[in-house]
Amino acid sequence: CGPGIEEAVRNYAESLPDAELAELLIAGVTKAELLDRADVQESLTLRTLGADDCLLAPLPNHLFTRDTSSWIYGGVSINPMCRPARVRESVNEEAIYLHHPRFADADFTVLGDGVGSGFASVEGGDVLVMGNRSVLVGLSERTSPQGVERLALQLFEAGEAERVVAVEMPKARAQMHLDTVMTMADEGTFVKYAGLGMLRSYTIRPGDAKRPLHVEANAPERMHAVIAEALGLDSMRVLTTPQDSLAAEREQWNDGANLLAVAPGAVVVYERN
């Protein structure tokens, strides 16, 4: 909001009861609302804004909580988001994990601080905890190679994982995250959008004194074999919908491959599919 009114905004926020502060951090505040509620000094920022312009923008995507943090074995990654409109969501998420009474006595590792640097973004929809101390991550339009490297380092240093497999996805709005095209149904079964095809992948393991990470590139045709190896299996089962390409594409737009496994072989899906 600019240094000219930073102190006024902070003082206003600190004066609010808990519920109103939460509303401010999620719903934001306009110039007119702030002038009506706070003692604001001279500010170039204010002079250039219209009455209904936001000083603190609302966070309408905050409902998609699977993106801002990812529980990975015994730790939680507070993810640096890709789009500027969602960056503050991770700040709010961090405050919850660090200060909410529900987590005060919990024993878990906090990975990252939710504030990305440059292109280092990771969104939870691209993170799949497979088991066998392995993690599958989609290199999508929202999760960058830099972000995956940083996450892998944090996981290895904390002892939460031993292997990260990154799959190079198409950079397309229709396949925004890995979980829109591929999810697990049980320990060795995946449901996959037929149009996804086989993807180039990278196996990331802890490095040594000379290099922090060991990265191995895998050919697209080895995609399933690489994932099976990470799971400690000889092979994996892949299920796709028995439809023609047009019908499959239409169902994928409705997240047809987006399952939530609540137990091995027991999944929650969208009724529309």
Give the residues covered by each predicted segment.
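The feature marks the mature, well-folded catalytic cores of soluble enzymes
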Residues: C1-N273
